[in-house]
Amino acid sequence: MDTILLETEERMEKAVAALDREFGRLRTGRASTSLVDSIKVDYYGTPTPINQLASVAVPDSRTITIQPWDRGAFALVEKAIMQSDLGLTPINDGKIIRISMPPLTEERRKELVKVAKKYTEDAKVAVRNIRRDANEQIKKMEKDKAITEDDMKRGQDEVQKLTDAFVAKSEKVLAKKEKEIMEV
């Protein structure tokens, strides 16, 4: 039963970590290298992440700089950024690609908060699905007479505690991201 609980906790941790990654891709008013991590460049016929083709830096809170190692990749990187759904406009000076982050409008901020809430809801659903799987495993153990009914109840209580903790953690991550998005 301990292995089920450990496995459950590990899977729930991964669900919240995935939420964190999704939030990293959400654009706030602040520049972040994680914004361009999800952008793939068609480099010699292979979709390649920007951070594998160039050094990505944030010199100030409103600018991202991208310096491709291969001079031939400048146009490809620029094209990939423009085609992404992030609404970013790259400026290529031949040596470096700069992306200036325009301030977000109030309307756009509210849209981003809605998206963040959707991501959080998806993470909570994932956590609850993991709970269901764990409870099914525990019930199966009881049915196979590997554990007693009391142990089954105790195990299900532990799984519920884990679920509550990770749902609360998701809410905390959302509150932090919401504050960051609404910050002017």
Swiss-Prot record:
A GO cellular-component term linked to this record: cytosol
Annotated InterPro entries: Ribosome_recyc_fac, Ribosome_recyc_fac_dom, RRF_sf
Record Gene3D superfamilies: 3.30.1360.40, Ribosome-recycling factor
GO MF entry, a single one: ribosomal large subunit binding
Pfam family membership, one: RRF
Annotated function: Responsible for the release of ribosomes from messenger RNA at the termination of protein biosynthesis. May increase the efficiency of translation by recycling ribosomes from one round of translation to another.
Family membership: Belongs to the RRF family.
Name of the protein: Ribosome-recycling factor
Species this protein is from: Oleidesulfovibrio alaskensis (strain ATCC BAA-1058 / DSM 17464 / G20) (Desulfovibrio alaskensis)
